[in-house]
Amino acid sequence: AHAANTVEVQEFMISPAGAPSFKDGIRWCTEVFHALAALLKERGLATSVGDEGGFAPDLGSDEEAIECILEAVEKAGYKPGEDFVLAMDAASSEWKSATKGEYLLPKSGRKFTSAELIEHWKQLCEKYPIYSIEDGLDEEDWEGWQQLTKALGDTVQLVGDAFFVHN
């Protein structure tokens, strides 16, 4: 993970999918960044940043992080799912347990099989405007990646960073 907090997903990212130009997209992202900083300050949360420049507040869950980001998108005057979509870097290779096909989430202690983790990603993608998941499964979970691709590959960009770097 890139920050010490209670969120399992390593990084959440925004993409200005509705921006008419690159220049506008950069401006939009900057506006959301500042709206998120203000929102975190209002809630008494830290606005320190992680290793790659993103905020690292101590939030209770991945969903709380997503909801904060979407609230900041709205606060900046944009529409989630239309003007902005989300991406996540799960870095789930770090969750691999000693049992093949099992994931142990380090902060919550929850356990998932590959199938359960795929269902978790599917539910998040149905509930929120998520367009990309990076490292949604462990780099050695070949069968899981096939199932993840079947479940989400037509609607969500699946990025295999660790999968391709280490295989």
Model-derived features: positions:
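Short acidic-aromatic active-site loops that bind/stabilize oxyanions
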Residues: 26, 59, 134-135
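Generic preference for flexible, low-structure residues
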Residues: 25-28, 56, 85, 149
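Active-site-proximal beta-alpha loop/turn segments in soluble metabolic enzymes
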Residues: 11-22, 46-62, 94-108
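Mobile "lid/hinge" segments at catalytic clefts and subdomain interfaces of large enzymes
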Residues: 1-50
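Fold-independent oxyanion-binding glycine-rich loops
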Residues: 1, 12, 16-17, 52, ...
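Catalytic core of soluble alpha/beta enzymes
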Residues: 63-167
